[in-house]
Amino acid sequence: MAAATPEIQFYERELNIRRVIEECDLQRLDQALNICDLSSVERKLRLWQKLLPRIKPFYAVKCNDDPMVVRLLAQLGAGFDCASKNEVKLVLGFDVSPERIIFANPCRPVSHLEYAKEHQVSNGTVDNEFEVYKLHTHYPNSNLIVRFKSEAKEAQCPLGDKFGCDADVDAAALMLLAKSLELKVTGTSFHVGSGCSELQAYDRAIKKAKNLFKFGALLGYDMDFLDIGGGFPGSDDVKFEKIAESVNTSVQRHFPDERVHIIAEPGRFFVAAACTLVCKIHAKREIRNEAGKLDTVMYYLNDGVYGSFNCILYDHQVVIAEHYLDNAESLPHLKSLIWGPSCDALDKISEDLHLPNLNRGDLLGFRNMGAYTMPIASAFNGFEVPKTLYFQAI
């Protein structure tokens, strides 16, 4: 039996987190609360379409595979970047056509390729000769998109050590190999790194892609597909506007031909700001100095790095705690340290911050928790993952 679709609560104008907290009665809930604003996702899509009208977004499912998010983006016409059979299956379940999916994993198990073939998901990336031979054997009529390496000088999560071939030598060799095997090379792909903060990174990569298109033409390929990857910020619209301006300029310079289909793989851009995590303090410990004066307060929350805060370890995120006290200005602010609930000393959320002297049962909120959080969360030590509530503007 299929799982029931979660309830969506509707709001007018702006989502009031404090009101949500009051109505949920979190004192009775052991789990942390993940508040997901689906309208934030839709607003980001509209912003993308406004600032990057030629580039179709293919949402990176790995970033947040919540079915409610995927369903919304499917309904709004977005494409999808999938890395596995299960991600492809999830997306197809929302009546997304195969043309709206790119299998953007250059190293796929054979069973995943066979699933893609069965469901006519033909666009996929390659960055090594073994994958080319694998496709020749298991999916010879697929569309090969050569992924090359072109990293940003500043990125939250660089990817070049694992994926992407050398753009100057290896990419051409893969195209020659594909030609000899009578496979179709339809385009190129790159990823400057997740959380890119260097404006020039995209222009460098797009220029390399243009050179490969020229080489492909010499081989007789009519390449018409460019994937500029991800890396777009999720919580800084000003920075995104600057990146969009740089990308538009580069695309117009190197790919003025409108027949070339250009896509991107934004993940955190769509979902980072959509989620606010609210945690409850279930324990507290005070540390005093040699003179007996209160020096540091340690708080223990009902979520940690084995849950939503895995983003600290795996995504290099810096999370910012905010309290919901009305009289905080009148309270002393003390050096504070925040721990997760598990028995592991690695389960540290934040340190060297100053908070008012909070008590057991008080709440702390963390914004921008929609990217690379819940998909990786586990119930380590028996602590439940957060409960998610969904909201949407009327």
Swiss-Prot record:
Cysteine pairs bridged by disulfides in the record: none
- Summarize what activates or inhibits it: Inhibited by antizyme (AZ) in response to polyamine levels. AZ inhibits the assembly of the functional homodimer by binding to ODC monomers and targeting them for ubiquitin-independent proteolytic destruction by the 26S proteasome.
Name what cofactor the protein needs: pyridoxal 5'-phosphate
Query: Could you say which residues are annotated as the site Stacks against the aromatic ring of pyridoxal phosphate and stabilizes reaction intermediates?
Result: 191
Q: Where does pyridoxal 5'-phosphate bind?
A: 194, 231, 265-268, 372
PROSITE patterns named among the record's database cross-references: ODR_DC_2_1, ODR_DC_2_2
What residues make up the catalytic site?
343
Q: Where does substrate bind?
A: 314-315, 344
Q: What stretches pass through the bilayer?
A: none
Question: Could you tell me what reaction this enzyme catalyses?
Answer: L-ornithine + H(+) = putrescine + CO2
Give the top-level enzyme category: lyase
EC number annotated for this UniProt entry:
4.1.1.17
Classification via SUPFAM superfamilies: Alanine racemase C-terminal domain-like (SSF50621), PLP-binding barrel (SSF51419)
In its UniProt record, a GO molecular function of this protein is: ornithine decarboxylase activity
As for what it does, the entry says:
Catalyzes the first and rate-limiting step of polyamine biosynthesis that converts ornithine into putrescine, which is the precursor for the polyamines, spermidine and spermine. Polyamines are essential for cell proliferation and are implicated in cellular processes, ranging from DNA replication to apoptosis.
Q: What is its quaternary makeup?
A: Homodimer. Only the dimer is catalytically active, as the active sites are constructed of residues from both monomers.
Q: Into which family does the record put it?
A: Belongs to the Orn/Lys/Arg decarboxylase class-II family.
Q: List the protein's name.
A: Ornithine decarboxylase 1
Could you tell me which species this protein originates from?
Drosophila melanogaster (Fruit fly)
Q: Which gene encodes it?
A: Odc1
